[in-house]
Structure formats: C-alpha cells, structure tokens
C-alpha cells in the first residue's frame, strides 16, 4: 500500500517506522526515491542514489541494536552536492570536477549514524559561490512558489527538496548566507551554526576558514534534532572544528535585547520592508527590548568577503582543478571570474586584510557589548531569473547584505519565516547571536513564532494549507534535560573543591552556574562534630539578610533520592530563592541547627568558600608546633596522624618495614625511611633505628600512635636524650602507669576507686596463695601488657599456675617485662574509659568517656560514646577521677583512664591508664569536633590549649567498629592475604590503611580499618553503623565484617546490655560454610562466566558442564547468575555454619549428609552444623553443588568464576583448600551485588537430567570449520575425523581436552608465513569448543583455554554439546558427528527452555535424525578481492555462536590489520544487533554473536554490507601508544623456564639448552645480534591473548628484525610472568605464569595489572591494545626485580607516549631502506629456510620416537599415609614433634604464627610422624602440606 509522505517531518517518519515493518518501511523509502528525477528533469537534484545504495543503507541501519532510539531513524535527507556522501558522486555543480568519494563526510556519517537515509545530492551555485542559485550547468532551481523566481543560492537544491516536502531535512553550506537566503525564499528554517561546530571534513571548500555546513528544515524541532546530531568535534579531520561548551546558553532573558539596523537598504523593494517591520513588532510583543544601532562596522566586515584575500581561499580550493584546463562548458563564467580574481592577491594582502578584519572586529565588539541578538532581513529581495541574468553580480551582492558578515564575526544565525507578500512569495528574518548561542536562538525563534503565528498558524515550505504543529516546533535544548533532573543549589561542603563534592559526582550532577541567593538569607557554620564543617542556610527578612554565594547543579531525578540519603542532620533539602527570583531545591537547616551552642554566623563572608579561606588564613597564623614529625608506627593510626600533620603543614616522616614498603602511610608521608626488616622486633620496636630515622630526617618530634613503642619508657627517655620531643608522657610517667601495680598506687593516691588486687607476684605458688585470698574468679595480668595480650581470667586454682606462667611469658616476649599481678574479677563488668589530656604541668582535662565493653578475648570490637546507661553523677565522678589522676602525675599529652564499671552497683574501679592515644579516639573527636592528635602535638610543643576555656561540648553519639583480618567462623583465626576488592561507605568516617591491592601481612596486628559514624543520638548512630557495615566490602582475606553486622544489629547491642564478657557467650551464626576436605579440584564458578574479554585473552571460565551447573542452581531456586561449586573427579567435604538448601547435579558420586546418603538432583535441606560429603565420581568427570542464594565471592571482569591458572575470580582466584570458609550471598545487604533466589526450590523431571555416559562412549555433535577440506585437510582426513573414535588423553583439564586418534592428512605441505607445519596459521582467535590441531594432535579448547593462537581448527563443539566435553574422563571414547548450525541452535534453545521452566519434555537431545549425512564446507561466503586495500574476504563458520572473518591471503599485512580495526570500530559504532564481541587476529577477526538476537545468515548479510562501508587509502593513520619497557636479557628466571622444560618435558631439541643460541644459529647471526635486535626493535601489537591475559602478538616494524624461528614442540607447561619470547616474526610477553611455546629471550615487567593499581591501567588491567607499539630498554635483573615489585604494587611509572602510527610515513621509511630489507628477506629464504625446515622436521621425528621424556618427580608416601594441611597462613614457628615420634589424634604437630597469635596444627589421626615439611621461618599458606603421619 503506497503512502503519501510529502510534507512529513522527521518525527512523522520516525512514527511511521515505529508502527511499520522493516520491509514496508523500506518499500516506502524506495517509492519516494523512485518518485524523484534528477537534472535536467528536476534541477534540484544533481543525482539520486540507486536502489542498491538504498538497500545497503537500510541493511546497515537495521543492524544497529539501538535503531528505534535513534533521533533520525529512517528519515530521508538530501545533501548538497559539495558535501561527500559515499555512493553518490560529488560534483560541486561542475561535471568536470566530479569524483566518487570513498567515505562519507563527517556530517553525513553522523546523520547516518543517527539513522538518516541519504536519497540524493542537490544542486548549487558552482563551487558554492553565489547566493542566487542560478550558477550551475545542471540547471536553475526555482523557488517552490514560482518557477520564475530563484530558490536562492548556493544551496538552492537543498531548500527546494525540503520546501517541496520531499525530505524533511537537507544539508546546505553557508560561507556568506547560502544556508539562510534559500530558507527565506522557500518558507523554511535555515540553521547556520556557530563556525566549527559542524565538521567540514569531506566538504568541498568555498572559503575554508569561514565555511559552515547548514541545515534546512520545516520546523524548529527538526533543525534542533540535526544540530544535536551534527555538533560533534572532529579535531583530527577539520582544522577549524571545535566542541560545543558543556553548558551552552539555552535561552535569552524574557526582555532579550535585540538590535536592528538604523538604516536598511531595500533596493527599491516595497513589500519585504513591511514583513520585516511586522517581525520586529512581533518580537516586541514576545518581550524583546528593541534597540537601533549603526550596522556599519558589520557591513564593513561583510565587504571584506569579496574585496579581500578571502577570495583567494576559493582559488586555493580549486586551483588544482583549474590547472587541468577543464572544458569551459562545465564552468559557470560568473563563478570562474570571481575565483580567478584571487590571482591578484599575494601573501602580504592576506595579512593586510586580516589586520583590517581584526580592527573592524574590535569596533563590532564595542557595538554589540550590550546586545543579545541581532535581527536583520534574511535577504532584501525576491529576485526573478530574469533579474539575476541581467545583473548577476549586483543581485548576488545585494542578497548578501545581511549575511556576509556573520561568519567573519564568528556568530551563529537562524533564518526563520516572516510571512508572505501579497504576490504569495515568502520572506524571512534572521536572528543572529554570538558564538555558541545556537540553542538560545532556536528558543527565541519559538517565542517569536508563538506571537507571529498564533495557535500554530505557521505553514512550511510550499504547503500553505498545512500548519506546523506546536509539537514540531517543540525544543528540548541541550541534553541536560530539566524534565529528567532536579536543579539543586549547594552552599557548603558540596561546593567545587570541598570535601563533599564527590557526592555530586557520584549522582552524575552537572554544574549549571554560580548564582547568589536573593537578599533574604543568613549563613551559619554549625558546630563541628566530625571532620567536615557543615553550613546552615536560613531564610530571614530582607532587612536582616544578605546574598549568599551558591553553586547550582542539575541532578538526574533517578539519583536525587540517593543524594538526599547522604545529607546529614540537622540539614535537609528544601528550596531557596535565587537572585533571579527562581526557586530551586537547596540545603536548608533545621532551627535547632543554627540555634545550638557553638554555631557561628558567617553571613558577612558572603559564602562558605570565603569563610573556609578565612579559617585557613587563621590557621596559617597559628604557629606550627613542629616543622617535621616522625610517626613511629604503621597502619591506620599512622595514616590518621599524617592527616593532622598535613592539616598543620608539618612535614611528616614515615618509617616502614619490608612488608610495609607500599603501605598507605608511606605513600601519604612526605618522607619515608626504610627500617630494613620484617618482624616488629626488627623494625617498629627497634629504638635505635627509629631514633636514627628521626635524626637523619631532622625530625623535631616523634609521635608513636598506639602499640609498638608508644608506652615504652626507655624509648621516651631516649628521645629526650637525643634532643627529640616525644609526643606523649614522660618516660617516668609511662613506667609508673605501665607497671600496673604502681599505677594502682598512683590511682589510690589520686582518690580513684580500686578493684581489690595484689602487687607484683614473683612465682606461680605465690599467685595461687593470693588468688585464694582474693576469691575466684581472678584476673592474671602482665604489668606491661596491652591490646588484649598478657591478660587472662582464671576460674579455679587448678589453672592458676599454668596461666601465671603463660602471662609471664607473654609479657616478656611482647613487652620485655615479665612482671605479673592479680586482681579480683568483677562479674558482668563494663569497660568505661575517660579520654584525658594533660599539659605536663599539673593541669588535666577529661574530654569525654567511651564504653568499650564489647570485647572478644579482651580485644575491643565496638566502642561508643557517650557510654549508655551511665548515670550523670557517675559519669561526672569518672571524669573527675581521671582529671585528678592526670593532675597528680603532671601527665602530658593524651592518656586514657580505664575503669571497670559495675552497672548493677553503679560503681566503678580503676583498671589502668593507657599512656598513649587510644585506638578508639575517633569517636571522641566525632562528638566534640576536636582533633586529639593536634592537641597532642601542641601540648608536646608546650603550647597546650587553655583547658579552662576550652568549653568542650559533646554533641550526639558516635560508634566505632573495628574491622579485623580474622575469621570469625574459625575461632577468629588471623586471615592475612592480598585484598582484591575494598569499598567503604564514603559518607562515614573510616580510618584505614588498606585499599584494593594491599597485602595484609601476618607479621602485625590484624586491624584493617575503624568504621566510625556519628548520629544525633544513640539510636541514630546505631542505624548509621548498621548501614555503614552493610555497605562495607572487603575481599581477599576473611574479615570479621559479618560478625560486626551481627553484633551491631543484635537486640543486645540495641538495648545496651553489654559487658566485657558478653561476647564470650554470644551466639554468632555465620552465613557460611567451611571446607573440611577440598576434593581433587574444587572451584567456584558462575554462568555464563567471564563474557566479553576473549579478545583480550581472558577465558570465560565458568562451568565445564554448564547444563548440569544451571540445573543445580535451578533446583535450589537460584538466579542464573548465582555462583556455585564445580568439583572434579573427587568431591569435597563441607561443614555448614548456617541453614540452607543445596542440590548436587552432574556426574554421579556417593553423597551423604551427616554420614547418611542423600539424592542428587533434588533440593536438600541442611542445618547448621551439618556435614556434607561428596565422594569419588563413578559416572562423569564433574559434579556441581548449588547452595540457595549463591556464594559470596567478588565479581571480577563481570563474573565470579574461578580462573585458577590466571589467579582471578572465585575464591581468592584459586581452587578451594582445606579450612576455607566461604560466605553465602545475603542479597538484603547494600554491599551485595548478586541477585537473590528467583524461584522456589524444585526437583526436575527425570528426562531433564543430562544423560551422562556410563560406558565411556560418547557421541558429540560438532559444526564443521572454521578450517576444512580441501584447503587445509584432505577430504579423506575429514571423513576419518568423523568415522574414527577419539580417545581422551590423560592430560585433559579445564585448559583443554586432548584427544588421541588418527593422524590428520594435510592438504598443504606447511603453514606458509604462519609456520613450518601444515597445522600452523597466522595467529587468530579460536572459538570456545574448537577442536584445535596443535601439530597433529587435537585439543578441544574449553572454559579456561587460550583464545589467540596459530593452529587450525577442524570443527567446533557447539554450546549445547559442550556439557559432554565437561564430563568426559581420560580413557573415554568420543565419536564426533557433524550437525548444522540450525540443529546446534535448536539444541541450545531446548536446554535454555528446560532450565527456565523445568517442564517435562522440554529438553531435546542429539539423535541420529539430527546428524548431517556428511561434513559441511565451513566457508559460508567469500567476497572477491577488489583492490590491495579491499582484499578477498572469507567468512568461515566457527561454531554456533562465532563467525571467523579472514582477509586476504596467508600473509601478514598491516593494511589488513587496519581493515580489521575499521570493521571492529564500525560494529562498535553501530552497536550491531546480536554481536557480543569482536576478537582481532593477525589477518582475521572472530565474531561472537547471540543467536537469540541474530541468526548466522542475518549476521552474514550485515557483515557483507559492512564491507562496502570500510574505505581507506594506504596513507591511513591510527592512534597508538608507544610503551618503553625494561628488559633484562636472559635473566635467571627466564633461563629457569628453559631448564625446567629440559628437565621435565624434552631433554633434547634444536632450541636447547639455550633459546637465544638457537635463534642466532638458524639466522646465521651472533648471540649479541639477537640481544641488540630486542633493544633496537619496535614491535607493533596485532592481537592480544597470546597466551592469556593481554599477552601481545606483536611484529617488529622493521622487516630486518623478523627472524626465522620455531615454537617449542611440545610446548612448555610453565613460563614465568613477564618473560619475553620470540616465535618466528612475532614477539610475545607472557602475562601470567602459563604454558607457552615462544623462544625465551628475557623478562620485562608484568603487563597484566589484575587490580588496576598502576596509573597506566586505571581503565582496564591489560597494558596493550592492538596497534600499540613496544620498545625495550636494557636493565639488570636486580633492577627488573625491583621494578616488578613496584609494578605489582601500582608504583612503577610505565613509560608511555601518546602517538599516531602513520602508515604513510612507515611506507616512506620502508622505501628508503628497501635495498637492505630486500637483501635481508632474500637471505631468510632459499637454502637457509630449507635447512631450517629440515632441522625442525628431524627434531620432530626424533621427538615422536623418543621415550626419554621426564616427568616431574613427586615425593611418594605409603598408601596409608595421612596428609596434614595447615588451615592458617603465617610463619612456620616451630615443630612440636619430630619425624619418628608417635602421636595421637588431636596432638599438636607444628605451630604457625600470624598476627601475634600462635596456632597449633593438630594431628588428624594417631600414628607415627613420617615427615615435618617445613623449617622454622618458612611462610605457610592455608592448605599447604605441613606434616605426614602414617
């Protein structure tokens, strides 16, 4: 059915396509095209596209995933014929000038990208020279209202096409008015943008420095739509291109000032002045203020255009053409004469006229300084063809009166209709604004139309009977849409550059401006209750108020709620009145906020920033207490201290141990001093080293923090002796307070209540006697203890002597003091402490109390202030007692007086004084606003604050939770490790030293962070603490975060029923399970795995049998993304710490729960404490354990799957080990990013279970290709592949399944450039499931396999059949059968439906009727070669979800590499429907696609269509980074890889014992020549993933560096990360410890930054991308080891240079060196190549007959031996038994020490010790073998 589309707007077309089918839409466009005729029949069209071009455009458009959302979807457009549009010739209205562009101009490309369809090229004044539209040999285009009147020039044809409604949009160009005059003469909108906003790349220039592409449209909406599409910077291709400002002017004020000319020459015209006058009146009615000015400066500027050297620009654009002496019949004489006048100008004239222009512009600026807009007649006349013929130059000149100056003055213009004359002809006016006012001009035009054409009475083009609807003139403005956002004014810490600005960034806010409020406001600084000062904005009367400076932002509505949630009390969101009278959302302050004590009125400063500046100035006036201070500590306290030092502008000095070399405190400090040691004793406790560091750095003071030397009297005294201030109490005070018996004496003197106890006790016997007198229970304490060490409770006398000796030992070991005393134990005691400060001269002040009762093993867990349930009288007494004690001692600096509080009796007793800053000091700071570290520094400098006038007010409540690296499900054992993901809530205070990439050492305290919140009261603080804990994420080591969440949300904590021992009986229920036996190879996987990184060399991992995995998840009701466990051959044993539901699917094994058999493939309820055992698999190779909710492991690159070889994903990037504790997903937590269960648990019907072979015979369907017969394999070889059975090799795993079977019969003698063996190919990207012939041996590439390689693949196991590959065992037999793509999809879709529904009968399996009778030709389509730059293209089937696209012949060609890059970019630009990933090889690209979104056939059609979209010449260039990397040539680690290969895999080979010698020998060069090549070559990266994780396949750019060579055969099983190899012409850098085959020559830094720690890898973990370049520079092995360590910690500055690879220059260089290059290439061929081939052939024959291969030697133990594994990571301290000793089950075998904790590894059974594996000092990981018992 035909559709009348004439007069349709862009939106009409879009609406039509939205309701139509693609076929009907296409046919409608085709009908429109066929209805048009080109010149001479229709002079508006120079050419029209053909049907093939239209079909091609439509096919490309349909391939785009987002086509329906495109702003110009399916909208036909016309293009002026001086603008390149691929598929149509460009003539510039000169037949002799005609050429066929190879690419679209930038503007046309942008419009096509936005969905537009170009239907033809329009007529113009030749070479865009003229304003009349008559200067073209293709005919004279009339205006759409009269065949006697001109359409205007030079864009006459474009205006006609829109004016007649053929297309809604057409492109013109505008140098001097050609985008505006035709609009006026055809009743259209003519948008002439700010110069440079639209690219002119691909436009035949008229006057290049002034040219603009313009838009003709029927309505404002279409004009704006095009403007937003086309206004994109194109800096690389257009010298005059520039970006639109991010916040362009959107509208003029209501009373916009519009200037009109004082005098308007009309040249005898009488009707047009009336229309102009009417337009001016309408603008007045619309609110404009009209002023009359002298336009002479602008008119003088206009005269420059044709009087000055700008005419020479027209000549510059065409001089080469005119030099060819084109036929005069093709030239317009007027145009030619104008252009040739340029010959009279010389270079000096250019400068003279430019000086003249600049002088005029100065006058113009003065004239327009108070003007917003100019309004002029678009053109004075409506000329007839006869009038133009009579006076062609004069009429043209008059028409340009009001247009010529606009581009010279760098202004924007919009021509709009003004109505009709009595003769029915239209006219218009032009609105002209300053640059970048384009949006504002459109909005002003809209205002004008509403007055000039009320109720939508405006018509468009020739359609005087149709009206423009208000919808079609609707404007959206810039993409910052008010409809989708909230305007928010900020007044305080959210201002740019202040601490909370990040919150605006987080919610994607856009800065709009910096207005002030109206005069009705006051601004206050509220009392500081934390690190950030808060403002309070209050509305008052104008008589007392002022204007306050604001910043206004646009916040997306969907993010506004998130922003509000971060607003702290007493602030809220209300509204504020701006100086303009507009009301916007803003911060307001509750009344109690600005009335509370401590609030400061800061209105006089006019704004918050100025007040902050004032505070900084005041701070600067205060004398710094010290110039340099050394922090004698590490971890979070060192980081926290440095913050204060920075605030006070004091230089900070950090000291660090070897493990802390890259710690945060070292990074933050101004100076760092290495202490050269690992243990605390060797470093942070070494007084001499600390003192030396202070003296070497001229530190005036040392601040010790807490722990280590903070309460060491000797250290304090030593500082004084050395003339260094110790920031803390005197050594004498530390001694008195540190020895608890003397502390009690002091307390007693100070009148502080004491708990009954003893003095120092010297023996266990004496301790026993005293304990009996005190009555049990008693506390045994080390007089020097702290931090929970040297402190134990004793309940009966049979324990007292043992405990006494233990505490005595701990005191001596940790604190160097064995003194011990006893104290009565107070039942249900609370721990309440007072923060005290002393000035050292007898004055002391109690700042507040803290309740620290929540302790585990005397280690504080959660602290809070004020202490709850504490009477004010008691609180006051405690403070007084603390002050009394401090005064008595003349205490100096911070100290904490700790009390035991008996809540029942409301009594407190002295516990001890911590003569240092406490861990929990931040909560006191939060409620007081003080900086206690600053107080300490000032006191230490004898500049103590005035305690009496301090007036400290406690505001609100604060809570701190300590985050420890310890395992709460394993008795809180230390849990060191590498942190792979760390996220803390940004709104809370978090004192920490860790971040992603931090290695938590076993050497020190396990504290990772302190999470601190502040609330208006305790309930509010508890709520915030729970929120903070729920948002906290730490992965890499087990932490107590789940334990903290449990406590903080408990009723016990809410009701403050706390006591120091309450956590001993707290029933913590971890949502976790524990591995008590790991099984053979047990990992965490998810489905579909790590998708989208195959091109980088990151395998998807995921389950090997995805169907069974998904089934297990579905049985328990999990979301499909839920991680579950894959087990191989032998399953694990698991202890559940929580109730849940499980299911086991896949291979068949003996499964039991609490030793009772359970069924597979059914949901099973498990309870807390249940033991699950999965035994050896009797059928199949792998089984799957799903747990309801899924397993909580971090997401890495979009997946939680384990890639153990790459140490990523899953649980710490590895297989599960004994003792691992894995937490389950808790979707209710804010920190959880994993969906919760999606279904109820349900058992599937039996026929949905996978049919796993129990007779070791398998039939597996495969698709043929990508490589087949006759080009790679002989036909009989392919037949044999399907007729024979293949045996599964013993060396099969997740990396690949090796097969044993008939040797292939090759159809070629070698791989050509790809390699010597016929299986070799230039590196390309394999399909997952590909059967890859590595030489003559096939391997099925599986979940953890490599992506990029150089071996052919005969067939691919499709996705639906891959589950079988996951279940085959070594020794099983496989019969491969060919199936079609359609069958493969059918099987896949049935599996998906079965999993989704669990409906009986949904699963379809491979049956004989689905098998093809014979193999298929994998070549789907082949396109012939068109040119050297458009080579042959072969599309190969590569499975049911991949197509391999190969270019050209079997040779490496950089033009092909670039073509592949262009195809990848094209797919990315179009977001092509269904394409998942594009993976680049040397001469090919593997395309992965989603069969649900696009079929194989449809994708082929799209790809074929794309080929004609790719156009370039040999002079292409591409962005390229040049990386300069350090290389240690033949370092020991590189040579170790070779030696290991020789010892374990192949003892003799041509490349052994030295790879470099081999390369040198076969190339007839020296060892040194190879080394020199590596340091002089530059390598170009062609692909990634060779082998794994971004490892590059790179080629030397200098052909003389491309050596003969061969890869290892067989390949290595181990290559060290960072090793560099060369294989023939290619270079590779191994990105992980992995297999490999390149010849090894040296080692560089790691190029895979897993955690993205380095500055060079912030976007992604891989270093290189295709077309990057690599150079090496020499370093020693020692230097490289240091660089590698820096790199692994994100501190190595990689040398990288942003560059462009210029192929033109490269070819020039090749030609300059062609003789030596040719000579080298000849030397590589002939006899040398033949000899090399013979050498490799002989070596391979020797390999086949050799039986001397060695296997790695493993120590063997008797069958009844029991392996004992460590459950902990730490340092092996000492064995408790020796080999030969007899032990019983439970006896201790060895001791592992970590984080101040000694952990015993017990015997699992009774027997004789065969071996203790480690020696003292060894580092032991959890799961490592430590002992063997028989």
Swiss-Prot record:
The reaction(s) this protein catalyses: urea + hydrogencarbonate + ATP = urea-1-carboxylate + ADP + phosphate + H(+); urea-1-carboxylate + H2O + 3 H(+) = 2 NH4(+) + 2 CO2
Start and end residues of each ATP-grasp domain: 744-941
InterPro entries: AH_C, Allophanate_hydrolase, Amidase_dom, AS_sf, ATP-grasp, BC-like_N, Biotin_BS, Biotin_carboxylase_complex
GO biological process: urea catabolic process
The protein's assembly and partners: Monomer.
Function as written in the Swiss-Prot or TrEMBL entry: Involved in uracil catabolism. Hydrolysis of urea to ammonia and CO(2).
Protein name according to UniProt: Urea amidolyase
